[in-house]
Amino acid sequence: MNNLDEIKIESKTCLNDQEQEVKIDNMHMSDQDKNKIEIKNKSGLGEKWPEPIVRVQSLAESNLTSLPDRYIKPPSQRPQTTIIDHQPEVADINIPIIDLDSLFSGNEDDKKRISEACREWGFFQVINHGVKPELMDAARETWKSFFNLPVEAKEVYSNSPRTYEGYGSRLGVEKGAILDWNDYYYLHFLPLALKDFNKWPSLPSNIREMNDEYGKELVKLGGRLMTILSSNLGLRAEQLQEAFGGEDVGACLRVNYYPKCPQPELALGLSPHSDPGGMTILLPDDQVVGLQVRHGDTWITVNPLRHAFIVNIGDQIQILSNSKYKSVEHRVIVNSEKERVSLAFFYNPKSDIPIQPMQQLVTSTMPPLYPPMTFDQYRLFIRTQGPRGKSHVESHISPR
C-alpha cells in the first residue's frame, strides 16, 4: 500500500466519524449540549457547500491570465482603490514591536507599549517569545510542502461548513458570494476531545509530529500573553484566562495558502474582518508581505520581522475588556509573483461559557457594552456569512 492509499483509508474513517457525530441520542444529552445542537441546526450549516468547490491553487497553476468573476471584488473593495500606505508619511509605519524577554523582566516601558498596542492598534509583533526559530521555520516549510502535494492527496481531507476542519477554499455559505483568493487547512488542538490526528494530514511524513509540537508551544505562548493583557487591564494576572475557561480553552490552527494571482489589483487573499475569537498568534511569511491592518482610515501593510509572531486581539477579548482593547479590522492582499503561506493560531475561550464584559471594567460611566453570548453562538456569524469587517461585534453592542 502506498502513502496515497493510506490517506484515502484515513479519510474514509474521518468521514464515518463525522457522520456518527451527527447521530446524537437526545436522551443522553444535557440541556447545554442540546442547546449547542439547536444553535448549529438553526445556522443551516450542513455537510455540503452551496456550490462546487474549486481549489484556488489549481486555478493559479492553470496559467490563468485573467481572474474568474467569482474572485473579482466590487470596485470599492479592491486593494488598488483603497490602499494608501504608499504615501511617504505612512510607508514607514509598522505595528508596535514588543520584546517579551524585556516585558517579563518587568520593563515598565514595554508594559506601557503593549497596553497602547492593544488599545490603539489591536496588533503587535513579539520577539524573544520563547518559541524556537527552527520550529517556526519547520512549521512554515512543512505546510508549504503539504500544499505542494498532488491535489488528490489533499482532497481526501476536504472540509465541510459544519466544522470547517480540514482542507478548504472558502469561508461562509452564502450562494453566489464573491470569494477570496486562498486555500487553507483548519485543525484543532484544544480541547483535547476535538484533537483528532486522523483529521490532520499524514504527508509530509513529519507533519503530525511537527504540528503537535508547534501547537503545544503556541498554547504556552498564548497563556503567557494572557497574563500580561490581564494585568494591563488592572485585573489579576490569571483573571482573563479564567474568563476564557481556565485550562479548558480552545486552540486551533488555520494554515493559509495564497497562490499567485493573475490580477491582484482586483482580488483579496482574505476580505476585511476582525477575528471572532480571543487572540490570534500569526506566523507570517516573512519573505512576502500581505497582511494589512486598518489604522484609522488607513490600511497599513505589516512588515514582518524574521522569527517574530504577529499577535492581534480578537472580538472576545474586546468584549471581555468592555472595548478597552480593540479587535481591529485586517485583510490580506495577494500578488502575481509569489505565493504566500501563513499560520494563524487561534487562542479562544471555552465554547459554551457566556462571554461578557468583566465586572471590574464596568462603571456607571462605562456600562457593559455587550450582552452575554457563548463563543459557539458568536462564531456562527463568520461560519455562515464569511468575513464582514467589524459588523458582527458592532451589531452586538447593547442599546443604551
Swiss-Prot record:
Cross-referenced Gene3D superfamilies: B-lactam Antibiotic, Isopenicillin N Synthase, Chain
Record EC number: 1.14.11.-
Keyword annotations from UniProtKB, A to Z: Dioxygenase, Iron, Jasmonic acid signaling pathway, Metal-binding, Oxidoreductase, Plant defense
Superkingdom as given in the UniProt entry: Eukaryota
Transmembrane portions of the chain: none
Reported phenotype of the disruption mutant: The quadruple mutant jox1, jox2, jox3 and jox4 exhibit reduced root and shoot growth, delayed flowering, reduced seed production, constitutively elevated jasmonate and jasmonoyl-L-isoleucine levels, and enhanced resistance to the necrotrophic fungal pathogen Botrytis cinerea and the herbivorous caterpillar Mamestra brassicae.
Record bears the keyword Iron: yes
Cofactor(s) named in the record: L-ascorbate; Fe(2+)
UniProt-listed GO biological process terms: defense response; negative regulation of defense response to insect; regulation of defense response to fungus; regulation of jasmonic acid mediated signaling pathway
Domain Fe2OG dioxygenase: 248-349
GO molecular function, one term: dioxygenase activity
Family statement: Belongs to the iron/ascorbate-dependent oxidoreductase family.
Name of the featured protein: Jasmonate-induced oxygenase 1
Organism field: Arabidopsis thaliana
